[in-house]
């Protein structure tokens, strides 16, 4: 058994289904949305992660992370590696210049743990610190607000080998130490910190389905796992993620925040779940799915504990927070980052209750079947509904939409990017509706700034608003029409379809 949503995400990365989404996006209504419709302090930006764009995996003292090792084992569908990626490690000045030309107000990037602490702890690599100092300073020189993510699925392989990474509580202390170094070295210039990217997705992909490294699940699973326990490990990993996040926030608030005056939060993959049918069973199943997928991360942040339905269905396999841990986790955010791409359709699956506990996984504990409907999966109303849900159920926390984007095939046509434009404009319009209805949403980041190494498909899928030619050693960057549209939107210019074209950098 394998979590159906992860299988769906993988399928959505593959070219055949991406083509379906392109056709669907061409049929989207265009939103008449303007930059002036948003509050003046609202930021529009774009994002990437170190793993996906930097390359230079063995230069200047950097050691391997789990993805560097995994990609060399041939696990990617296209057999690609993280070795070079977009080579942003060497080309960050060029990339920041492109951001500035587009008019990005903010850039969300991540810091590579093994570039800062090559051995996971202890020795601080001055070359790694220098790189991020240079990147941050260059962003600020161009008037771009740095939003830094401390961990984006790329912990040191040495810690995975030493004690099993996120399955061990030792990771909490090592992550906190690493975060402390980041705050100390960069916090005087970084205004927005995200501790961990998508812990709910990592816990499922790495420890439930085994789809991403370290590829653990109840053997053999859909991905031929050799070790793991899908009935226990995803919950254990998520528990450690939350405690590590809260521990890092405590360090930041105690030692740095008063002087540095930055904000800190956690990023959550924001599922919007809708019932497959109007039956009572599917409606109740949708409530369960929302609690499991989203409440798993959000409830502890706001209430200090996991959702009641999770405790009922998972039982003793779900770790418990001590009183002190609950107090530490509760309120451990100044904002919540949400990543959102698709609507998930939920169907009740009562037969899962008969699955033996030793064979259970996340799906069977939820007792639902989750799927994405081609043609409906990119419904922009999903983002509006998700933001409304956080407003109504979590006290309307400050939210940044950290990721939202459109995947196209590797061989995308360079003279046609209208599908991505309609996708982005549709979601921006939906987000605006949520803001008008009271959501405290403060920023939007397109995923992604440029085509990159995608964790489920390597270089087979392109999410960037900037095209990267991976077949050319120069890795030539080109602005896609979506970059031009986004630029004109941010700069408050009107653009007709005939005026949009590719431009080379």
Swiss-Prot record:
Pathway this chain belongs to: Pigment biosynthesis; anthocyanin biosynthesis
SUPFAM superfamilies from the UniProt entry: (Trans)glycosidases (SSF51445)
EC numbers: 2.4.1.300
Residue ranges of the TM segments: none
Signal peptide span: 1-25
Catalytic activity: 1-O-(4-hydroxy-3-methoxybenzoyl)-beta-D-glucose + cyanidin 3-O-beta-D-glucoside = cyanidin 3,7-di-O-beta-D-glucoside + vanillate
UniProt-listed InterPro entries: Glyco_hydro_1, Glycoside_hydrolase_SF
Temperature dependence: Optimum temperature is 40 degrees Celsius.
GO cellular component: plant-type vacuole
Binding positions for a beta-D-glucoside per the UniProt entry: 52, 152, 197-198, 341, 403, 447, 463
Gene3D superfamilies linked to this entry: Glycosidases
A GO molecular function held by the record: beta-glucosidase activity
Glycosylated residues (UniProt): 224, 229, 324, 411, 437, 494
Highest rank taxon of the organism: Eukaryota
Localization (cell): Vacuole
Catalytic residues (UniProt): 198, 403
Functional note: Beta-glycosidase that catalyzes the transfer of glucose moiety to anthocyanidin 3-glucoside at the 7 position. Anthocyanins are ubiquitous colored pigments that are responsible for variations in petal color.
Official protein name in the record: Cyanidin 3-O-glucoside 7-O-glucosyltransferase (acyl-glucose)
Classification lineage: Eukaryota, Viridiplantae, Streptophyta, Embryophyta, Tracheophyta
Gene that this sequence comes from: AA7GT
């Amino acid at each position: 058994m394998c979590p159906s949503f992860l299988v769906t995400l993988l399928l959505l990365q593959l070219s055949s289904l991406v083509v379906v989404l392109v056709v669907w996006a061409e049929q989207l209504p265009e939103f008449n949305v303007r930059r002036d419709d948003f509050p003046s302090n609202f930021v529009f930006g774009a994002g990437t992660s170190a793993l996906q764009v930097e390359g230079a995996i063995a230069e200047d003292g950097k050691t391997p992370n789990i993805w560097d090792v995994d990609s060399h084992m041939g696990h990617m569908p296209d057999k690609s590696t993280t070795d070079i990626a977009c080579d942003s490690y060497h080309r960050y000045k060029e990339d920041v210049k492109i951001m500035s030309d587009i008019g990005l107000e903010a850039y969300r990037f991540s810091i590579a743990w093994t570039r800062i602490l090559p051995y996971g702890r202890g020795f601080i690599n001055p070359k790694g610190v220098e790189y991020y100092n240079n990147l941050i300073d260059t962003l600020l020189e161009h008037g771009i607000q740095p939003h830094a993510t401390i961990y984006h699925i790329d912990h040191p392989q040495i810690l995975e080998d030493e004690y099993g990474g996120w399955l061990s509580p030792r990771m909490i202390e090592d992550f906190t130490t690493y975060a402390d170094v980041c705050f100390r070295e960069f916090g005087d210039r970084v205004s927005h910190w995200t501790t961990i990217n998508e812990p709910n997705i990592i816990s499922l992909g790495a420890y439930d389905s085994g789809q991403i490294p370290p590829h653990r699940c109840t053997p053999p699973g859909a991905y031929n796992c050799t070790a793991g326990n899908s009935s226990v490990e995803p919950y254990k990993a998520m528990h450690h993620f939350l405690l590590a996040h809260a521990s890092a926030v405590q360090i930041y608030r105690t030692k740095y925040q008063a002087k540095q005056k930055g904000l800190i939060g956690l990023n959550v993959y924001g599922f919007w779940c809708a019932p497959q049918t109007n039956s009572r069973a599917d409606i109740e199943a949708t409530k369960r799915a929302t609690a499991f997928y989203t409440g798993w991360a959000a409830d502890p942040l706001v209430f200090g504990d996991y959702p009641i339905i999770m405790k009922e269905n998972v039982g003793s396999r779900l770790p418990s927070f001590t009183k002190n841990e609950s107090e530490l986790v509760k309120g451990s955010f100044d904002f919540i980052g949400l990543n959102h791409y698709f609507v998930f359709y939920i169907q009740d699956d009562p037969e899962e209750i008969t699955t033996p506990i030793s064979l259970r996984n996340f799906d069977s504990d939820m007792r639902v079947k989750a799927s994405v409907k081609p043609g409906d999966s990119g419904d922009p109303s999903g983002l509006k509904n998700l933001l409304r849900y956080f407003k109504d159920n979590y006290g309307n926390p400050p939210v940044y939409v950290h990721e939202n984007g459109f995947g196209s095939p590797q061989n995308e046509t360079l003279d046609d990017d209208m599908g991505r434009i309609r996708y982005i404009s549709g979601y921006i319009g939906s987000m605006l509706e949520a803001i008008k209805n009271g959501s405290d949403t403060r920023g939007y980041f397109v995923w992604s700034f440029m085509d990159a190494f995608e964790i489920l498909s390597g270089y087979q899928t392109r999410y960037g608003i900037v095209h990267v030619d991976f077949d050319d050693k120069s890795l030539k960057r080109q602005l896609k029409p979506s970059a031009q549209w986004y630029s004109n939107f941010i700069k408050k210019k009107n653009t007709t379809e005939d005026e949009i074209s590719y431009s080379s950098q």
